[in-house]
């Protein structure tokens, strides 16, 4: 039986208009069988997306051959059949949304197959219900959040009934509930016989697959089951990747709990393997650790009773924010979380004047954003914003020029090169290697780094980040969060939104949770994450380490509530074991 997809010594080069080449794939040979569930992982720029676009002939190999169900992708007459066989959900959903109404976009593919209207209607309805977008079916896609756009794109592919779906970072922009739904859909589709190929930076997602392919510099570095790949931590780390969070926690706890064996890759399997606590006594129960309020902290951002309606007075009117109030202190790190469509991006865009208050007040340092004579340029010099999708703010041809654009507008001349170098180093881009790279040859993660560097190069006092680590590989994510903490320590005020609770646990000191445009829960990171049932009601969940600690508390372990770091969990367990309490 033929493999569903077969690559034989495939190479691929990107070629710029001026003749420059960039080798993205090198001599790759792989076979993908019908019904497999494969995760493809690798550092930013390793060639994952380039590889994926060969699976349905969006890219054609520079050398070697790609066969899909026995059809050569270089034969253009084969392309319709190939693209009916292999569907793809892109990293950025805007790349594949073509219609002005959600249900019309989902219908686009089936219509091009020449199906009967009744069959098209059934496929569209089934796909929209599958991704929980039935209520949004008549809305324009441009009014949806990024996470909702991802689900529109997925629905469009599902409506084609392909034999294989390639998910290219499909969950990167989704909230925990939406992400869980997509992963469950992937599992269900796989159980029903569909071939699933998942490109991801989330190691816990990769652990769900039957097979993992690890890429590095356009080549296959590792290929095996998740257990085989994750058992070689040293090689994995050297490739810019990491173990799943649960596996890292298990490794840290193993010196104290040797019964925790290898291969614990998921939160659920780890909690099941942890022994119950013995000899529990009330005297060992800890109180909730609260973060003390700093009465001397200086408020830098004040939002009171803010409301915003898109397309007010039209049939498409949509209330994005209602009565939102937050305060961000100078030199602090403030996180905004919530499900997709909860108003996070809308709130952030009020903090540098991209949107102005319709109701309520927003004050940024000395600036009242409702003031008729507001110096908006001064506000934007003070406040930098990195958008959720970096392509929306990249427009120069070369990386160096992109990052230098802002400082040039501010009149920086004498130290421009050094300022650009500093910004690139802060996000982990080597100056000499990247300054002359063409922006269109960059991976999604590399573009995100360039977008961040282009804002940092202007030396703002406040940095707003909309999903700052989305699309970054584990090493780049870890490095970025560390550098943001260092910048905060040097006096930068951070305000950021994210669906990744692990990032919030590392970086945020205080959080506010938005639900349907309202601030429903605000407090220190530990306080918010300790309220797991409330978070579940809001469509969120605490980070893995908090969930593991909560599971241990249910087993009788007298641990602090609201633990947000792996080091703290391991320290507390070590103290209990060392004291002979268990």
Tell where the protein language model's regions lie, with residue ranges:
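Conserved ABC ATPase "signature" region
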Residues: 118-136, 415-433
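Conserved ABC ATPase "signature" C-loop
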Residues: 218, 516-517
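Helix-to-loop junction immediately C-terminal to a conserved catalytic motif
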Residues: 56, 352
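The feature captures the beta-strand-to-loop junction immediately N-terminal to the Walker
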Residues: 41-43, 337-339
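ABC ATPase NBD Q-loop/coupling interface
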Residues: 65-81, 361-378
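Conserved ABC ATPase signature
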Residues: 140-144, 148, 438-442
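Catalytic Walker B motif of ABC-type/P-loop ATPase nucleotide-binding domains
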Residues: 165-168, 463-466
């Amino acid at each position: 039986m033929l493999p569903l997809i077969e690559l034989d010594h495939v190479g691929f080069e990107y070629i710029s208009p001026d003749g420059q080449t960039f080798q993205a794939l090198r001599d790759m040979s792989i076979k993908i069988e019908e019904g497999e569930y494969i995760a493809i992982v690798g550092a930013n720029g390793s060639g994952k997306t380039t590889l994926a676009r060969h699976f349905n002939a969006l890219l054609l190999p520079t050398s070697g051959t790609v066969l899909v169900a026995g059809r050569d992708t270089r034969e253009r007459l084969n392309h319709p059949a190939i693209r009916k066989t292999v569907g793809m959900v892109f990293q950025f959903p805007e790349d594949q949304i073509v219609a002005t109404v959600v249900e019309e976009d989902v219908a686009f593919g089936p219509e091009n197959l020449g199906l009967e209207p009744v069959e098209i209607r059934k496929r569209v309805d089934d796909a929209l219900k599958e991704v929980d977008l039935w209520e949004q079916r008549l809305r324009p896609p441009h009014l949806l959040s990024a996470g909702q756009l991802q689900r529109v794109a997925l629905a469009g592919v599902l409506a084609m009934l392909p034999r294989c779906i390639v998910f290219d970072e499909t969950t990167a922009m989704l909230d925990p509930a939406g992400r869980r739904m997509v992963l469950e859909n992937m599992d269900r589709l796989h159980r029903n016989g569909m071939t699933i190929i998942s490109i991801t930076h989330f190691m816990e997602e990769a652990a769900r697959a039957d097979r993992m392919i690890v890429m590095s510099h356009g080549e296959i570095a590792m290929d095996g089951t998740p257990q085989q790949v994750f058992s070689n931590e040293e090689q994995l780390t050297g490739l810019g990747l990491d173990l799943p969070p649960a596996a890292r926690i298990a490794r840290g706890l193993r010196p104290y709990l040797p019964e925790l064996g290898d291969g614990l890759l998921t939160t659920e399997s780890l909690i099941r393997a942890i022994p119950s606590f013995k000899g529990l006594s009330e005297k060992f129960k800890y109180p909730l650790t609260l973060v003390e309020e700093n009465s001397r902290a200086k408020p830098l951002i004040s939002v009171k009773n803010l409301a915003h309606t898109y397309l007010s007075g039209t049939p498409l009117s949509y209330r994005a924010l209602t009565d939102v109030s937050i305060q961000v202190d100078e030199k602090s790190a403030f996180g905004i979380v919530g499900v997709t469509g909860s108003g996070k991006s809308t709130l952030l865009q009020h903090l540098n004047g991209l949107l102005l208050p319709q109701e309520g007040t927003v004050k940024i340092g000395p600036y009242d954003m409702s003031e008729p004579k507001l110096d908006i340029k001064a506000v934007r010099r003070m406040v930098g914003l990195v958008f959720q999708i970096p392509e929306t703010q990249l427009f120069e041809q070369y990386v160096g020029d992109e990052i230098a654009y802002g400082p040039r507008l501010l009149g920086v001349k004498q130290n421009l090169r050094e300022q650009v170098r500093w910004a690139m180093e802060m996000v982990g881009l080597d100056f000499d290697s990247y300054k002359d790279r063409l922006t269109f040859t960059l991976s999604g993660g590399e573009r995100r780094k360039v977008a961040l560097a282009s804002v940092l190069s202007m030396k703002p006092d406040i940095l707003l980040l909309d999903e700052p680590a989305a699309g970054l590989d584990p090493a780049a994510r870890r490095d970025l969060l560390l550098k943001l903490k260092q910048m905060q320590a040097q006096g930068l005020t951070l305000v950021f939104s994210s669906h990744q609770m692990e990032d919030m646990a590392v970086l945020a000191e205080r959080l506010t949770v938005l639900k349907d445009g309202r601030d429903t829960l605000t407090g220190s990171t530990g306080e918010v994450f300790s309220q797991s049932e409330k978070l579940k009601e809001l469509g969120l969940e605490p980070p893995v380490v908090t969930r593991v600690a909560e599971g241990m508390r249910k087993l009788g372990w007298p641990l602090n509530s609201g633990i947000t770091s792996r080091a703290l969990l391991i320290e507390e367990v070590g103290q209990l074991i060392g004291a002979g309490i268990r």
